[in-house]
Amino acid sequence: MPVTNMSALANGHLEGAAHGASVSLIFDHSEPGQGPRLHRHPYDETWVVLEGDLTFQLHDDRLRVGPGDIVIAPAQAPHKFTNDGRARANLLCIHASPTFRTEWLE
């Protein structure tokens, strides 16, 4: 069973294909006011909010989330999030793909 320490990951990204896995992970650390631009993937993406307060946009819906919340974006759903809290937000992003594939929409 392969083991990878998070400190060895480039920018917190673990692409599953390089480790024989069918999923890829991002350990995201967003400072207040930060987050990715609107984008989508050809596979589902799931986030586990570990710390922080964020607003997710999924299609035209906006969702306020915090620690312990899990957000799921289906394949092809446009989405983004913003850390609108006062402290760093920490999330685990699970991509249902052995490689990252992103279409940036803005």
Roles of regions detected by a PLM:
Residues 67, 82-83, 103-104:
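Short glycine-/acidic-enriched loop or helix-start segments at secondary-structure transitions
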Residues 75-100:
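Ligand-binding loop in jelly-roll beta-barrel domains
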Residues 60-75:
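Short acidic-glycine-tyrosine-enriched beta hairpin
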Residues 1-23, 27, 37, 103-106:
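A short, N-terminal "cap"/entry segment at the start of jelly-roll beta-barrel domains
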Residues 46, 53-55, 62, 78, ...:
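Structural motif
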Residues 20-23, 30-34, 51-53, 62, ...:
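Short, charged/polar surface micro-motifs in flexible loops or helix N-caps
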Residues 29-30, 40-56, 94:
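Short, conserved beta-strand element in jelly-roll/cupin
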